[in-house]
Amino acid sequence: MKNTVLIKKIYRETDQFLSKEVMISGWIRTLRASNAFGFIEINDGSFFKNIQVVFDDKLGNFKEISKLPISSSISVVGTLVATPDAKQPFEIQAKEIVIEGMSNSDYPLQKKRHTFEYLRSIAHLRPRSNAFSATFRVRSVAAFAIHKFFQEQGFVYTHTPIITGSDCEGAGEMFRVTTLDPKAPELTKEGDIDYTKDFFGKETNLTVSGQLNAECFALAFRNIYTFGPTFRAENSNTTRHAAEFWMIEPEIAFADLQDDMELAEAMLKYVIKYVMDECPEELQFFNSFVDKGLLERLNHVVSSDFAKVTYTEAVEILEKCDKEFDYDVSWGIDLQTEHERYLTEEHFKKPLFVTDYPKEIKAFYMRMNEDNKTVAATDLLVPGIGEIIGGSQREERLDVLEARMAELGLKKEDYWWYLELRKYGETKHAGFGLGFERLIMYITGMTNIRDVIPFPRTPGTSEF
């Protein structure tokens, strides 16, 4: 409706609307009525808090309104009146209520607390619950903050392809894209699937990262970023992994690993601070009902410098500590979540950059250090989550990059265009990837990745 006011606007600019007629539209959260008057808590999704509507038997459809089930949609015209002695700061005294849509009486989200596991089974309705309406508003605000940060820094927003013929991570855990008949694909003389007959004429997959394409643009525009969906065919049924998730991937030219870490820290602090400023009600809800120490932790992150250690130093700390881990610690292993959380939660008690990882556990494009054992890579670890950002200085030396690819059995012809970047004005450059869902988990205190993405895609689950 043209003259409808958002509930958020009424809360944020109350003085503008007090004692004036307003029109709102939304869904009934609660309704209680007697023979002569009633109260409706209505929410339109724009704000965490509801607004109370008072109606009486002067309305021509009073009896019909009094019997409306929860989640019915209505439009209300009435006067906004201050209520200084009540629980809510104001209410709308209704002059007219229009029923937009009736809800069935078997609506699953009745007024009681539901488990997150149950709410995942009704993902099409869970945005209407308090926890998930708060989560997805925070997600929206955080996404905007990311764009705002990079645009203010002069970065160029770049769209990288979702369908790709390259494996950025070299891990092979990719979803295949094909139009070949799965029951009877055409075969080569050797009996292998003939991908030259496929739609793209070669093997193609859903992207695991936009980084390689992003480097092309960084070496033209200097500072760029991508923000889009990525896909991993990892059969990991954990609270931290999903098959489809969103990644933020900046690339900066004329930059080394130190520049990369400074950018990551500045971006993370900016986004968290922005969400704290824009979503105080949501974060207070999470602090009260999800994670009691959330606000204290977020304030600490924004106000303190991040720690930094090398991988070798981190391993030494873990080997010397008294804590028993499920996974043994030794130089050369990929740090597990329990190791990362010990470092951030018990030893440093703050976010931590770990740098200079063994080359064997990192990707081919990361710049080789002088020791020929480690690469100029970093992971940012945060309390409660573990790794949230992975980045590196990229290998700009063509001969070193080709040697590393040969060592890993990667075919140069599959990456010919990526290698050509090193022939035409190569320069040092760096970048990182931030898993957006893990960031939202950190900001909200939610502990399962399935609860911070609207319709999660995990092993065995593609519903909705």
From Swiss-Prot:
It catalyses: tRNA(Asn) + L-asparagine + ATP = L-asparaginyl-tRNA(Asn) + AMP + diphosphate + H(+). The keyword ATP-binding applies. GO terms for biological process: asparaginyl-tRNA aminoacylation. GO terms for cellular component: cytoplasm. Homodimer. NCBIfam families: asnS, PRK03932.1. This is Asparagine--tRNA ligase. It comes from Clostridium botulinum (strain Eklund 17B / Type B). The gene is asnS.
